[in-house]
């Protein structure tokens, strides 16, 4: 699902787990069983796959677009994060708060051991090819690659508020900055080039993640935004959707809904 999917793997095993993220410890206490899997903090999922649930959730769309950019300082010790939220509807109130999560992909170590309780569970074979790997693997798995690993976080237990100004006006972007500080102190990090920043927009009334975005981290003096590149004074496309509300990154055959940086929204017929 590419950039449509934002995964965060939270390890809370303490000293027994080298990937433990202490910043997530208080939020992790909301979930008593391990492992557990949920979507948008409001839908508990099964352990094996959730394609149907994901596609249904994606098709619903959201009341706002969320984009994010991130850049290192020269010492690669601090990361400046700039979320950009554009609402599709007017609202008088703002029950929203932000959470910021730093993740790393492709983490592994020959000394790490993953205990595999599904080893030999042949009755479950065929659910997914990924799950078949664990069925065929030994009880103790070495050299397992860990992705989406939470490294640092803020606002995951109590979302940070005060950044969305009211009344909210449709098609008027709102942005602010947040800084991940002293990243070099996170000894868990293996490869800074594999880090990504996730921004979660959370409804404080419901506890639900309303929308989110992720991005890589640019080098100093450059800018890379998750889905927007815009020159000053230049009208550019900022978002594209299918008729059923699903956000897409490239034109797809049929009718596309296109939003532009000057606030215009138009229908575009793509024939090939």
Which functions belong to the PLM regions below?
Residues 1-2, 243, 267:
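Acidic/polar, low-complexity intrinsically disordered N-terminal segments immediately downstream
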Residues 3-221:
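Short, conserved sequence motifs used for protein processing/export or organelle targeting and
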Residues 36-40, 240, 256:
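Short polybasic amphipathic segments
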Residues 205, 243-245, 261:
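Short, ordered coil/turn segments that flank beta-strands lining enzyme active or ligand-binding pockets
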Residues 214-246:
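Residue-level detector of functionally pivotal "anchor" positions at catalytic/ligand-binding pockets or at interdomain
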Residues 247-253:
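Conserved beta-loop-beta connector loops within the AMP-binding
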Residues 255-272:
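C-terminal tail/sorting-segment detector
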